[in-house]
Structure formats: C-alpha cells, structure tokens
Curated annotation (Swiss-Prot):
GO molecular function, a single term: zinc ion binding
Name of protein: Putative metal-dependent hydrolase BCA_2790
UniProt source species: Bacillus cereus (strain 03BB102)
EC number, UniProt record: 3.-.-.-
Binding of Zn(2+), residues: H65, H156, H160
Length: 173
C-alpha cells in the first residue's frame, strides 16, 4: 500500500542540478496556485474539513499550510540573496495548522498564494547562475543551496496537491 503521507514520494533530485531542471521547477511553482485551486474545486465544507489521511491535516489545513510554508520560503530566498548563508528561523508547522486562521475559507489562502507566487516566480526568473549557489542555513537540516530549494518547494506544492487529489480519488469525490 502506498504511504498516504507521500503520494508522489519523498523529495529527491538528480545531481548536478541543470538549468532545465530549474526551469521545470520554477514552472511548477508558477503553476501551483492554479493546480491547487483545481484540486479543491467544488469541494463542500465537510469535504474541506476531511483529513487527507487518519491523523493528517484536513484539506483546509493543507491549503493554508502551503501558503504558510511558501511565505517562509520566499523570505528564506530573499535572506539568502541579501546575506551570506543566513540562519533561518524554523517554525512549528503542526502548531501553525492549529491556529484560528487555519479555519478560514480556503479562498483567503488561494488569493495569497496567487499573489505570493507572482512575486516569488518573478524573483526566481531573475536569478543568475551564481545566485543559485547561494545558501541559507536551517538549524535542523543544515545548509541548503537556492537551486535545491527551488526543487524542494516545487515538490512541496505537488506533494500537498497530491494529498488532496489522492483523497478525492480514494473517496470518489
């Protein structure tokens, strides 16, 4: 049986990272707002409040989490581009998912995601090759190059979209 936590598998990538890989990943980041919107299309409130797996987040929490995560990533990119290997601040995503704003209508986060991704994609397309080598330091996972972070967040968007689409498929929604 597939691991419901990782419907598209865990994040991996081939080395070295090529310009073609970067372009594909940026396109996936650019496409995410539309893909996530399609994934939740026509879901009612009960469906939005259904966990994608036992013990997992609800569809609503997943949508809000994607925005929380990608806002943090956008800031991490800006820090890495303006400071030398900055140490970023991790956050407790499971606790953020329990805050009151995670119960808001999903449209609130979809609008934020659309705007955020327009800015982020603009920034990503402006990067030079040397910018892709810049890094940030995560206190728990260590140093990350921006090139790899682009891939990670492209995967992250597809990963959470697949949580929703696989739930829909399993429950025939």
């Amino acid at each position: 049986m597939n691991d419901l936590r990782y419907p598209i598998g865990q994040f991996t990538y081939k080395r070295p990272i090529t310009e073609e890989m970067i372009d594909t990943w940026i396109q996936e980041i650019e496409d995410l707002p539309n893909e996530l919107t399609k994934a939740i299309k026509d879901l009612d409130q009960k469906q939005l409040d259904t966990p994608y797996r036992v013990g997992g987040w609800t569809v609503r929490q997943v949508v809000h989490h994607v925005v929380d995560s990608h806002m943090n990533s956008y800031i991490r990119f800006k820090l890495a581009l303006t400071e030398k290997n900055p140490t970023i601040k991790p956050y407790k995503e499971e606790k953020w998912a329990e805050l009151p704003d995670s119960k808001l209508p999903v449209d609130v986060s979809l609008v934020m995601l659309e705007s955020l991704h327009k800015r982020w994609v603009n920034l990503l397309y402006s990067l030079e090759l040397e910018d892709l080598e810049k890094t940030f330091n995560h206190p728990e996972t260590g140093e990350t190059k921006l090139a790899a972070a682009i891939g990670l967040y492209a995967w992250h968007g597809r990963h959470h979209t697949a949580h929703i689409t696989s739930l829909r498929k399993r429950l025939n929604w």
